């Protein structure tokens, strides 16, 4: 869920991919992440199993950990309970396949047909410093998708809550696509196109991390951008959207908790869509490779593991999670404040990056918030030509957008309460991810900027929480 995490820049013409990069990393320079090949294999196997387990526990075990009943062996439990429920409810029907495939294809169609704006990415040394063009219209795609879903719902063609009602089968479909597309893309890059970079020579690890940097279908449909910005957050939004419709049809009203989830996921989906062109020049788009980690996680992992709050509310009766008016209002206010800092902070660092590059034309897409753009911001000029922002929210905390992002996710779980462990999966997992990324970036920046990084730390001494951490 975290947006791109660096506020440093020289300009948009400074390559992020080193000029000495080769297709294979020298053996003595390989630095494995995520536990290396064994860790990568464990995650490729473990994450799909975890997603299925959490869904089964949420739907069939009252939101508690699915465990053997008294006197039941683990073998019988796995075969008779878990596997049988997966077979009955988790194997996709033709409708599930058609729905998810259609959703992906429609989003791809919107990507290449709806209005938008053009921007350019970072110069890429593996393409002789070429800057790839990006067409950004996710905001149009988002609201067109909402209108289309409402038309289909009220004409009786497809209820808005179809995905929520069939979440097991559709999740399996997404898992299948995530795994199979990762394998297919890796094999094509290795044996057909030769588009692979920074490889270790270990196929398991390399497929997990990815082979290509900027895979595209045709000239403009960038797969990394497509799957990162649209698919996961649109799915989460429509699960929440469906939850509200389902509650209204079932109870005649929509609970504050369901409204909160819809509001929370609208905030994030809209933020990703409206800020799409700000993602283009980031480290993620220019440097991170596109493999299982990004492809699977965006098409399946994010939407169908981060949705546990939605599932908890969907599968429990409203009286289970009724809170006081004051508590509900507090969480609505808290997420709104956190979103303000998240939105304006990301805008500050990205508008700074683009203005330094001489490109100050940025859309003011709804909601455009006060203090989003800095006037004459302060910065440190580094010996390598880069600029480090020391103004705005970042003078208080270098990763303040991480903190604001995390507070948003925390409110999701707080709105569900403590009756089930699964709504807390995302905040716990996300905390680990953000801390890992924060200190990873610290090491990379210290290596990249040297003594200038020490100056930067003097100006911006705190990472996550002002005066604390």
From Swiss-Prot:
Bilayer-crossing residues are 36-56, 97-117, 138-158, 174-194, 225-245, 290-310, 322-342, 415-435
Q: Where does NADP(+) bind?
A: 349, 353, 389, 401-402, 441, 445-449, 456
Q: Where in the cell is it found?
A: Endoplasmic reticulum membrane
Q: What UniProt keywords apply to this chain's record, in alphabetical order?
A: Endoplasmic reticulum, Lipid biosynthesis, Lipid metabolism, Membrane, NADP, Oxidoreductase, Steroid biosynthesis, Steroid metabolism, Sterol biosynthesis, Sterol metabolism, Transmembrane, Transmembrane helix
- What is this protein's expression induced by? Expression is induced by fluconazole and repressed by caspofungin. Expression is also repressed during biofilm formation.
- GO terms, biological process: ergosterol biosynthetic process
The organism named in the record is: Candida albicans (strain SC5314 / ATCC MYA-2876) (Yeast)
Catalytically driven reaction(s): ergosterol + NADP(+) = ergosta-5,7,22,24(28)-tetraen-3beta-ol + NADPH + H(+)
Q: What is this protein called?
A: Delta(24(24(1)))-sterol reductase
- What would be one Gene Ontology cellular-component term for the protein? endoplasmic reticulum membrane
From start to end residue, where is composition biased (Polar residues)?
1-13
Q: In which pathway does it act?
A: Steroid metabolism; ergosterol biosynthesis; ergosterol from zymosterol: step 5/5
Q: What is its EC number?
A: 1.3.1.71
Q: Which GO terms describe its molecular function?
A: Delta24(24-1) sterol reductase activity
Q: How does it sit in the membrane?
A: Multi-pass membrane protein
- Region (Disordered), start-end ranges: 1-20
Q: What class of enzyme is it?
A: oxidoreductase
What family does this belong to?
Answer: Belongs to the ERG4/ERG24 family.
Return the Pfam families for the record: ERG4_ERG24 (PF01222)
Q: What does this protein do?
A: Catalyzes the last step of ergosterol biosynthesis by converting ergosta-5,7,22,24(28)-tetraen-3beta-ol into ergosterol. The third module or late pathway involves the ergosterol synthesis itself through consecutive reactions that mainly occur in the endoplasmic reticulum (ER) membrane. Firstly, the squalene synthase ERG9 catalyzes the condensation of 2 farnesyl pyrophosphate moieties to form squalene, which is the precursor of all steroids.
Organismal lineage:
Eukaryota, Fungi, Dikarya, Ascomycota, Saccharomycotina
């Amino acid at each position: 869920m975290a947006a791109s995490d660096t506020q440093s820049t020289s300009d948009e013409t400074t390559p992020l991919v080193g000029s000495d990069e080769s297709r294979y990393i020298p053996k003595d320079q390989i630095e494995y992440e995520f536990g290396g090949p064994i860790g990568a294999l464990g995650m490729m196997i473990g994450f799909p199993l975890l997603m299925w387990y959490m869904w089964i526990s949420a739907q069939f075990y009252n939101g508690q950990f699915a465990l053997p009943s008294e006197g039941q062996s683990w073998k019988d439990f796995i075969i008779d309970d878990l596997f049988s429920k997966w077979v009955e409810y988790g194997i996709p029907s033709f409708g599930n396949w058609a729905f998810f495939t259609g959703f992906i294809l429609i989003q791809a169609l919107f990507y290449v047909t709806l209005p938008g704006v053009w921007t350019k990415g970072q110069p890429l040394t593996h393409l002789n410093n070429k800057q790839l063009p990006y067409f950004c219209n996710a905001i149009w795609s988002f609201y067109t998708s909402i209108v289309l879903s409402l038309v289909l719902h009220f004409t009786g063609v497809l209820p808005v809550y179809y995905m929520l009602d069939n979440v097991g089968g559709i999740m399996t479909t997404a898992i299948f696509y995530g795994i199979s597309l990762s394998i297919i893309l890796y094999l094509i890059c290795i044996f057909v196109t030769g588009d692979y970079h920074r490889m270790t020579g270990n196929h398991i690890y390399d497929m997990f991390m990815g082979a290509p940097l900027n895979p595209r279908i045709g000239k403009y449909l960038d797969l990394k951008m497509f799957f990162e910005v649209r698919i996961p957050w649109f799915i989460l939004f429509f699960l929440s959207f469906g939850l509200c419709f389902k509650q209204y049809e079932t109870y005649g009203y929509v609970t504050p908790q369901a409204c909160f989830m819809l509001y929370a996921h609208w905030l994030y989906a809209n933020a990703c869509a409206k800020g799409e062109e700000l993602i283009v020049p980031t480290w993620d788009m220019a440097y991170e490779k596109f493999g299982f980690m990004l492809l699977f996680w965006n098409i399946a992992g994010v939407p169908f593991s981060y949705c546990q709050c939605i599932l908890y509310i969907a599968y429990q009766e409203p009286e289970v999670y009724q809170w006081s008016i004051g508590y509900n209002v507090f969480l609505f206010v808290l997420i709104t404040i956190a979103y303000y800092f998240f939105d304006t902070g990301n805008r500050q660092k990205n508008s700074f990056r683009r203005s330094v590059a001489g490109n100050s034309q940025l859309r003011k897409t709804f909601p455009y918030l006060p203090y989003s753009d800095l006037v004459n911001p302060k910065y440190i000029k580094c010996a390598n030509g880069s600029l480090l922002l020391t103004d705005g929210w970042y003078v208080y905390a270098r990763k303040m957008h991480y903190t604001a992002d995390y507070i948003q996710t925390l409110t999701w779980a707080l709105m569900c309460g403590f009756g089930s462990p699964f709504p807390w999966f995302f905040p716990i997992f996300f905390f680990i991810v953000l801390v890992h990324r924060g200190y990873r970036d610290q090491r990379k920046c210290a290596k990249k900027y040297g003594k200038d990084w020490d100056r930067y730390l003097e100006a911006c001494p705190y990472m996550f929480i002002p005066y604390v951490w």
